[in-house]
């Protein structure tokens, strides 16, 4: 017993990133050396994906409803320009990911994907019709059937109603439920190393190394989009606000915020770091004390990239050709879906099924794509969080410095 406890304590002291990396490496070895054992280990992957499928609909519903219910009206701290920058940045990231997904179409190997047939929509009209019908689905059925469009719609409506008519106690109960569900998600994510081990070992046993090559290309597209946003798009947005060389500010935010966020992999955990940096930059305290925590929820360029690229990869893998109008709609959906993803472990990955539903892709296939996201998540999630969190303080600084420039003129 003492040995078992000490072993668990020793494992607990190892970071989740290293545990996932170890599970990934062990899965490759087992799947290559003993395919039969690799296939048997696939049970761990199936259990992990099953747990994600069970919690994802509840997570989206509770989290979005709580976020809307807790929103404060009548804030006079110059927040609106920053929110505009957050939305512009997130939509620009989603649009960049759409273009990259079309220029570099990626096919990924999904276990059992050949057994699932997805009927591709004929075009934007059919997609919009399906979207509208899903909006008015029964909320209980929407959660039970993982209809993420319906879940999002009902969560927005319920959150708005609670904000306007609910008591403080009721809103706090919803917030506590959101925190509880987020905690359950974190517990499930703690089993990610074991789940990744099972997924990788069974994938290698079934398909060989072709799947990992597909994942490498997928990761290259994801990281390429994030680097492009961080070093090209975001500086252009900052220049638009401050009208001077944006790169000193950009590199300061990447160095003093992005590096921390890369290793913590949590925008929420990086809020104190961003607060300290905002104070160091001499920004307006009444502004950044609100915009930094808000940005940890709604400023989600990295999440929008992840959702868009993986959803398009799922579409191409299922043989669905994506027209530009549908891709543009995907950008909008990814922008809305990304809001609220950062404070939750694996949040952006768990919102991929919502985007996949635009293409008529089943929830089973979508959750296999989520599993692929966890396989590459050792790097993807770190880079995504670094982009998200560093942009929180970057856009806050840009808006504040832009306001100072306008006042001086």
From Swiss-Prot:
InterPro entries: Na-dicarboxylate_symporter, Na:dicarbo_symporter_sf, Ser_Thr_transp_SstT. Keywords: Amino-acid transport, Cell inner membrane, Cell membrane, Membrane, Symport, Transmembrane, Transmembrane helix, Transport. It catalyses: L-serine(in) + Na(+)(in) = L-serine(out) + Na(+)(out); L-threonine(in) + Na(+)(in) = L-threonine(out) + Na(+)(out). GO terms for cellular component: plasma membrane. It holds the Pfam family SDF. Gene3D superfamilies: Sodium:dicarboxylate symporter. It is found in: Cell inner membrane. GO terms for biological process: serine transport; threonine transport. HAMAP family: Ser_Thr_transp_SstT. PANTHER family: PROTON/GLUTAMATE-ASPARTATE SYMPORTER (PTHR42865), SERINE_THREONINE TRANSPORTER SSTT (PTHR42865:SF8). Belongs to the dicarboxylate/amino acid:cation symporter (DAACS) (TC 2.A.23) family. NCBIfam families: PRK13628.1. This is Serine/threonine transporter SstT. It comes from Neisseria meningitidis serogroup A / serotype 4A (strain DSM 15465 / Z2491).
